[in-house]
Regions:
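N-terminal non-catalytic structural scaffold regions of very large proteins
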Residues: 1-177
C-alpha cells in the first residue's frame, strides 16, 4: 500500500467526511431494528425510534458500524465510515487541537490507542505519535463501503445528488497534481 498514491489531501478528506457523515445521513428516519453498541452490548436505540440529531451524534460517536432504517419499500442498511469525535472518548481533553486533532478520527486506531495506554498523559502522547493514522489522508476500507452504500441508497431518498456544474465544485489544480 502506497499512501501517496491514494492521498486525498485535506480537501478530499473534508469531502468524504462531509458527504459520508453517518449522523447527517440517518437524521429524520425511523430505525427498523434495535441499535446495539458493539463494544458494550448496550442497546443505544430501539426499533421504531425516530432518529434525532442528538441520537444520531450518539450513534456515530459510539462507532456503530451500521443501522437499519425504514425505507418506503424496504429496510435500508446505512453503513458508517467509523469516524468519531475524539472528545467522546477523552472527555477530559479540553482542546483536541493541542494534540493536532482538527477533525473526526478513525475509530479502529483510536480504540487501539485507548486499549494500549492507561493514563491520560500516555494516551495524549500516543495520539500525537499516531496522528497520521488517526486522521487518515487516504481512503479507508470503510470509506469505500460507505461510498458505495451512499450511492446505492440515493434512489431511496437517502442523501442527495451533487450538482457537478455548481461553481463550488471547481478548484484550482496545483502544478504536478
Amino acid at each position: 500500500f502506497d499512501p501517496r498514491r491514494y492521498d486525498l489531501a485535506k480537501v478530499g478528506r473534508y469531502k468524504f467526511n462531509k458527504k459520508l457523515h453517518f449522523n447527517k445521513r440517518i437524521v429524520g428516519h425511523k430505525l427498523s431494528q434495535d441499535v446495539v453498541d458493539t463494544t458494550t452490548g448496550e442497546i443505544l436505540a430501539e426499533a421504531e425510534t425516530l432518529v434525532t440529531r442528538e441520537l444520531a451524534d450518539t450513534l456515530q460517536n459510539s462507532a456503530v458500524p451500521y443501522v437499519w432504517i425504514q425505507g418506503e419499500e424496504r429496510e435500508i442498511k446505512v453503513l458508517s465510515s467509523l469516524m468519531v469525535d475524539i472528545r467522546h472518548y477523552l472527555p477530559e481533553l479540553e482542546d483536541p487541537k493541542s494534540l493536532g486533532v482538527t477533525e473526526l478520527v478513525y475509530y479502529p486506531v483510536l480504540e487501539k490507542i485507548l486499549e494500549e495506554n492507561d493514563t491520560f498523559e500516555d494516551r495524549c502522547e500516543a495520539i500525537k505519535r499516531d496522528i497520521h493514522d488517526l486522521i487518515p489522508k487516504h481512503i479507508t476500507k470503510e470509506d469505500i463501503l460507505a461510498s458505495i452504500n451512499y450511492n446505492m441508497h440515493l434512489e431511496y431518498g437517502l442523501g442527495n445528488d451533487d450538482d457537478i456544474d455548481h461553481l463550488g465544485n471547481r478548484r484550482i489544480r496545483a502544478v504536478g497534481e
